[in-house]
Design a protein with these regions (language model features):
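Non-transmembrane, aqueous-exposed alpha-helical and coiled segments at domain scale
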Residues: 1-280
Length: 280
């Protein structure tokens, strides 16, 4: 059994919150540059040039990529041979988010009640997900999630008879309905299977996966390529002004489901798809 003091998580989460909001992952930058090279229209190229310039300034000056620094989603993959000591895990995670958003001068966007509102003032609580995995390590991933794109996300409980065409049409419907609202070019996370809640989580986790990776099953890997091509043929384009680049990536995550169902969730993210990880 390996003991880990929760204060280590606090320090790492503080750092990851700041790093994620200041610096886009390399796979996202590469995808944006690749799409820029493929664009024909001057408006679309100009917008992508502005996006590239924006993240280069953020890198150089250590400032947020976007004013919406999101709600902090924290994913912990906890080795089953780990024992946390030194305090409450939930409190340690929130303290890391609190410090990150205060010390990193990141916008505080969380309200304490969904209806009555009232800003918490420090961007807590985090949305915390935990998975138990083999081993004695902990992988920490922080993914700040802006809500211009989150509000465009949808879930649908398909019957098995709808088949793969039902899922394809739904993905296109979600993206087309979103239009310019999620600040395209977007990244599309798709979750298929599980239950109502699990499909949504799969879609969220799909957004954390690097854009230069594929689903391990060839059927879904091919579907990722096919749907990205179809989305980009919609012509929504960068910031909704038209062009070839409506999305820079589409990732699918799947799991088994009930014989009577085929849940599908689509989680939309803007081009500022932010996530950083560290293993202890």
């Amino acid at each position: 059994m390996r003991e880990i003091n929760v204060s280590q998580l606090t320090d790492i989460i503080e750092k990851l919150c700041i790093d994620a909001c200041y610096h886009l992952p390399c796979d996202v930058k590469d995808a944006i540059k690749t799409c820029r090279a493929c664009e024909d229209g001057e408006v679309a190229k100009g917008i992508l040039d502005n996006i590239i310039e924006n993240y280069e300034i953020a890198d150089a000056d250590n400032v947020p990529i976007c004013q919406d620094t999101g709600m902090a989603c924290v994913f912990l993959e906890i080795g089953q041979d780990v024992h946390f000591v030194g305090g409450d895990l939930r409190e340690a995670v929130d303290e890391g988010v609190r410090r990150g958003y205060v010390n990193g001068y990141l916008r505080k966007s969380v309200v304490r009640d969904p209806v009555l509102r009232g800003n918490t003032g420090d961007n807590t609580p985090a949305v915390l997900y935990t998975d138990i995995v083999p081993g004695d390590q902990v992988k920490i991933t922080v993914g700040p999630k802006g809500f211009g794109s989150e509000n465009m996300s949808m879930i649908r409980m398909f019957k098995p008879s709808h088949g793969i065409e039902g899922i394809k049409n739904f993905i296109l419907e979600v993206v087309e309905t979103a239009g310019p609202n999620p600040c395209p070019p977007m990244v599309v996370g798709v979750g298929i299977g599980g239950t109502f809640d699990k499909a949504a989580l799969l879609a969220k986790k799909a957004l954390m996966r690097p854009l230069n990776t594929s689903h391990p099953d060839k059927f879904y890997a091919d579907l990722e390529v096919e749907m990205l091509e179809k989305i980009n043929k919609l012509g929504i384009g960068p910031q909704g002004f038209g062009g070839k680049t409506t999305a820079i990536g589409l990732n699918i995550e799947t799991m088994p489901t009930h014989i009577a169902g085929m849940p599908c969730a689509v989680n939309i993210n803007c081009h500022a798809t932010r996530h950083k990880s560290e293993v202890i």
